[in-house]
Amino acid sequence: MLKTKRKSKKSKHKHSEKTTALSKKEVAAQKRKTSKKRNELVQAIVICCLVSAAVSIPLLFVARPKIAIAGGVAVAILQFSYKYPRQALWSFLIYLPFSGTITYAIGGGNAAFQVAKDAFYIPALIGLIQSCKKKQLPLFIPKEMLSTFSILLMMAMLTLIFVNGEMQLNPMKGDKPILQAILGLKVLIGYIPLIACTYYLIRTKKDLVFFGRMHVVLAIACCLLGLIQYLLLQSGKCAGTRGMTGEELYKATLQARCFVGGSLVFSPEVKFIRLPGTFVAPWQWAWFLISNAFLTFASAFCDPSFWWRVIGLFGMALVFANAVISGQRAALVMVPVTTAILLVLTGQFVNFKRFIPIGAGLAILLFFGAATNPGVVEQRWESFVDRWNAAPPQQFLFNQFEQSHNFIIDKPLGRGLGRATNSTRIFGFTQLIETFQPKLMYELGYPGMIAFQIMLLHLAFLTFRAYRAVKDKNLRSYGASFWVFVGFITINPQYYPLDVDPVSVYYWVLAGAILKLPKIDKQVQDEKHLELEGHELEVHDQLKEKKIIASAPI
């Protein structure tokens, strides 16, 4: 009996010695790996600096200093984004809400700055594709959507070849129909790969939580800048469109630009305000606020940390405040409606006590706002009611469909890719169509419009199925919050949010995040079933996380 006890003690001692030796080897290997990565980073920085200088110095002789420096920085970003796609995709999401401000503050409105975010996205996408090929991982996610996407792509290519191609044979003066079609196609489907990018970007629950927190911080930063912009205009430090006459009082202009963002309207004498926040145009700011009603809600009710939930609630309050002062009717209506819908559909109504602090905060904020700016909320509501009465949304949408139908009576494949896309006007004439489905009908005809809408509905179904398969309560709430946004944009008939920032990015990004939830849920469920305690559990979690990170393409 005594001998067996001694043997068991010796075996335990040997096992602990092996474990210690193994852990020492692992630590040494980790140190070598870290050192190698550090050296690679230093080398990459040196090369990027040299290439950037080689580009900037010659440009100084032919362009303004700002443009020359920006050109060099752009080349460095392209190199870095290709080498470090993961960091590039995070940078892409961070840069997005500030792109309008950077475009005018640094670029002076240069068109190149409006697509500068793609300097992060495109090289990162190329890097991801190469990494997926090496690790034999799927490139197109979700695989089930490949059929509907292929049909859409086929319809788009038919329009490009037979409609834009025909126009290219006999173009109008100044028109470049093929270039317009290529840019139009990029706007239409160029960000669909963000589904796969986000799917591989979010590897674990930690990444998902970081994703939510990052967007809350971005929302708070942008909303604070938006509040400052409003206060500067209200105090008269920025003139806005005060003192102008006739139509100029109602027209967004860059001459009225204030502090951040781009063109705006601020004509208090006629009770007409349209603020751009940190974006190029007021409509983009409205849809940023609507998008962040979903993103801040997700963190406010799903984040595992109490303090981050409080920060999320603060973000929701700021989004609501900006929806009131921005002058955007869509944001004024959709932000509170969205919050109410999310409370019901995500099942968070049972946690309504969490909503009490934000309710009290909003009440104080609105009371203070009403005291210092009497009539602001009333003006916004009156503006919304007047607009509704002047042009009811259902009638406006019907008129848009009728107009597009009349344009394509003799053109079954539409009028051409990019011909109703605002960002392609540098390559030729564009028709102003203010709603998305009629715009698709004008460009691609009935077949193309139906193909695109079917693809969106298919994606909405696949994401719904993915989030409903999740068992973990918190992850399911994240999925529900994200899916309501995807579902809303899928069936939204007003404006064309999928054509412009930020919705053209957020829609595909959140779809990718939802599709990853079942895998993250499996990781969480596996951890729950482990019968480990204390240090053993911590070591196991670290090893598992390392394996997940090592197997990921980025």
Where are these regions (language model features)?
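N-terminal hydrophobic segments of proteins, predominantly signal-anchor/transmembrane helices
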Residues: 80-109, 115-190, 489, 549, ...
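Loop-to-helix entry and N-terminal half of a specific, functionally important transmembrane alpha helix
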Residues: 311-319, 463-495
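Hydrophobic, aromatic-rich transmembrane alpha-helices
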Residues: 69-83, 121-133, 289-303, 449-470, ...
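Long extracytoplasmic/lumenal interhelical loops at the membrane interface
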Residues: 374-447, 463-470
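Transmembrane alpha-helices of multi-pass inner-membrane enzymes
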Residues: 339, 357-358, 480-493, 497-547, ...
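Alpha-helical transmembrane segments of multi-pass inner-membrane proteins
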Residues: 2, 150-157, 193-197, 210-236, ...
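A membrane-periplasm/extracellular boundary helix in multi-pass inner-membrane enzymes
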Residues: 2-5, 224-238, 266, 323-326, ...
